[in-house]
């Protein structure tokens, strides 16, 4: 089996499992790099030792972030299991331990400051969708005109995480910011298949996540509360925290975030965890 034939089979297997386009792209990248490293004529001759050599090479010679390295591990392990039918153990495809604590998440008040101070209509619209609707960065850059329903004020998100379709609501304020940006860009409701955030380099394509992330990071550096580990994804933390501060129930926040688990949603909520001086008397009705 040639490398190209095996990649085609790999993508068919990923499609059958309804994995997202982002996962497809990442897995394709890492398996392709694995082939460049091993240069196999027949991929069926590849072994787990080859995979381990490749992953060791990544660890020893490249300074990839832990999460990026773990994506590479997942990609190679999935390829071996789905295409070569070789099942390695967790010890053979060892992933790095990643801290799940964001040290300096963007607070709701900071997110509002970012929105109010932003002079770039494109970035302001993206921030409004990230903080005001809780949308992921990849959901924002792939948003099309047809996905925005002005009458009922909701957005349809196709190919969301897990290759699912979900809907999110948006406020009048978010609508005004988005409409202002579209007016400046000349984006109209007639161009239904057009991207809201088009690529500046490739006609007909959408802006990449890296471009939006880079623009946001540069903007953050002009703000007084900037810290290096703050990212565009922090706006989702601010979205969840802001809803929790307004007493929106956790299951509702979970649905709006598009999470399968309430535990995942709870991780996004950053509220003071101070214990009360006295335990409330739960045996007496509140007046």
Map each language-model feature to its residues.
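Conserved catalytic core of the tyrosine transesterase superfamily
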Residues: 1-287
């Amino acid at each position: 089996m040639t490398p190209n034939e095996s990649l085609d089979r790999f993508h068919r297997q990923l499609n059958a499992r309804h994995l997202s386009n982002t996962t497809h792209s990442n897995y394709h990248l890492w398996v392709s790099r694995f082939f460049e490293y091993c240069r196999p004529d027949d991929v069926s001759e590849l072994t787990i030792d080859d995979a381990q050599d490749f992953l060791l090479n990544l660890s020893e010679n490249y300074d990839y972030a832990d999460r990026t390295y773990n994506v590479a591990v997942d990609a190679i392990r999935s390829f071996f299991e789905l295409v070569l039918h070789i099942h390695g153990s967790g010890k053979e495809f060892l992933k790095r331990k990643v801290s799940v604590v964001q040290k300096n998440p963007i607070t709701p008040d900071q997110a509002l400051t970012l929105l109010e101070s932003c002079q770039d209509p494109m970035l302001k619209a993206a921030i409004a969708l990230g903080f005001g609707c809780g949308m992921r960065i990849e959901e924002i850059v792939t948003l099309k005109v047809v996905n925005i329903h002005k009458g009922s004020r909701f957005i349809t998100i196709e190919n969301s995480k897990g290759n699912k379709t979900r809907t999110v609501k948006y406020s009048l304020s978010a609508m005004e910011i988005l409409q202002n940006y579209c007016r400046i860009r000349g984006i109209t409701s007639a161009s239904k298949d057009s991207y809201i955030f088009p690529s500046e380099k490739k006609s007909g394509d959408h802006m990449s996540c890296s471009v939006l992330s880079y623009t946001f990071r540069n903007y953050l550096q002009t703000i007084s509360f900037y810290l290096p580990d703050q990212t565009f994804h922090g706006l989702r933390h601010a979205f969840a925290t802001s809803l929790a501060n307004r007493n929106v129930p956790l299951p509702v926040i979970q649905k709006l975030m598009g999470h399968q688990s309430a535990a995942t949603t709870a991780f996004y909520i950053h509220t003071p965890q101070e214990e009360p001086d006295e335990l409330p008397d739960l045996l007496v009705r509140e007046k």
